[in-house]
Amino acid sequence: MTHSIVAEGITSCDVLVVGAGPGGGNAALHSARAGLDVILIEDHPAIGTPVHCGECISDIACDNLNLELPPHVISKRVHGIRVIFPDGTAKKLTEEGYVLEKHLFERWIADEA
């Protein structure tokens, strides 16, 4: 079942975003920052749940997306990550960034939008 919260009386918008995950949340956030009227629709009763996987974001991504992360969404500061692919090969990425509390990050993005 789809759940949505839409302010009473809203009949139109400039941007309709379906899905409040990291991609949809960012689309809604940047559309709202651009002065557009945005409606964000999520099919789960609470944005950020159920948690499907962890989430990391680099400093470069934060800069490119113009995100200033609030402390409550950050789980840990990291100075690189090691990615292990399904075939067992590994690659080390040295970009600094954050491990996020994904459910809190998604809720924050939606609230900001």
Mark where each language-model region is.
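Conserved glycine-bearing catalytic or ligand-binding loops at nucleotide- and phosphate-handling centers
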Residues: 77
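Short, well-ordered alpha-helices that flank and scaffold nucleotide-derived cofactor binding pockets
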Residues: 29, 33, 63, 111
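Conserved N-terminal helical subregion
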Residues: 80-113
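Glycine-rich FAD pyrophosphate-binding loop
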Residues: 16, 20, 29-52
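Extreme N-terminal leader/targeting segments of oxidoreductases
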Residues: 1-15, 33-34
